[in-house]
């Protein structure tokens, strides 16, 4: 039985698959398929990403050979990312991916110092592999390394949860099944970091003294219209434990509301432990020492009584 398939996007052929299925009397059929990708657009995957949490751009090229039994096929070949980027508007981050080929050898996707850039010249590199030999339970074993990496360099927008500049050193490992990864390592926040976090669910409420009497709202003024709940990015079943060193010169600011009129500013350092659980809980445990003081800016602040 022969197979011939192709995929067009905007009237342009972007994927071709040719091959044959070889049935046997034992029922353990085998196959031989060659697939070619030519400028396969990754943005078509954006429709499957909920709430546009991240946006893919760029093309994928490459050739794949699929052989062996239909129950346990072997995949070999290479994939080339052509100007591929991943944008997260909430976190103001745009990651640019290496254009060097990524090899697929016997169902292993191999990363050889695969580089990811943002706005700086220093890359974030990945070494290791993702193993698909057991299709029901793909496994990963990856080493992550970055030195003086520009993790964030973004201005504030209406969608921002984090903005400012973050520079970091990172050395970490990621291992385990893709639906339950374990990440361990060290993160060093460098002294030129100046970052702000927008607190969307705050127990502190900023309130005008006349707010309980009358409120005038102009629907053409987008700053006074009720803001829709901002979707958050989930990291799936990731179990992360990172030892963090924060340089004493690091500046961290927390916007207590979307107006940017009420904020807390911290300057200091420490060595806390950062944990992220598979349930989505993020905690920091340890000592943080103020070196440049604490600044609180607000109009009228109401604290909860319970």
Predicted segments with their positions:
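Interface amphipathic segments
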Residues: 1-63, 71-78, 82-170, 177-301
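A short, hydrophobic C-terminal helix/tail in secreted or cell-surface proteins
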Residues: 302-306
């Amino acid at each position: 039985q022969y197979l011939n398939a192709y995929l067009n996007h905007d009237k342009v052929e972007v994927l071709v698959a040719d091959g044959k299925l070889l049935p046997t009397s034992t029922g353990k059929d085998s196959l031989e398929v060659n697939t070619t990708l030519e400028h396969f657009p990754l943005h078509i995957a954006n429709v499957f990403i909920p709430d546009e949490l991240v946006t893919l751009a760029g093309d994928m090229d490459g050739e794949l050979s699929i052989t062996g039994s239909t129950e346990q096929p072997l995949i070999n070949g290479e994939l080339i990312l052509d100007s591929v980027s991943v944008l997260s508007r909430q976190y103001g981050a745009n990651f640019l991916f290496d254009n060097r080929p990524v090899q697929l050898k016997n169902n292993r996707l191999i990363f050889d110092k695969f580089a990811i850039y943002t706005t700086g010249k220093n890359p974030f590199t990945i070494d290791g592999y993702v193993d698909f030999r057991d299709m029901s339970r793909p496994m990963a074993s990856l080493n992550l390394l970055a030195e003086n990496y520009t993790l964030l360099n973004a201005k504030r927008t209406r969608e921002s949860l984090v903005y400012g500049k973050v520079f970091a050193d990172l050395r970490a490992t990621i291992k385990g099944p893709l639906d339950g990864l374990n990440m361990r390592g060290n993160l060093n926040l460098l002294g030129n970091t100046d970052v702000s976090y927008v607190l969307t669910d705050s127990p502190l409420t900023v309130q005008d003294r006349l707010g309980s009497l009358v409120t005038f709202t102009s629907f053409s003024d987008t700053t006074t219209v009720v803001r829709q709940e901002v979707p958050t990015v989930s990291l799936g079943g990731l179990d992360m434990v990172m030892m963090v060193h924060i340089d004493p010169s690091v500046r961290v600011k927390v916007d207590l509301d979307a107006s940017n009129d009420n904020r807390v500013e911290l300057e200091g350092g420490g060595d806390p432990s950062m944990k992220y659980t598979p349930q989505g809980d993020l905690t920091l445990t340890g000592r943080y020492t103020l070196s440049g003081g604490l600044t609180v800016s607000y109009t009228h602040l109401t604290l909860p009584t319970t």
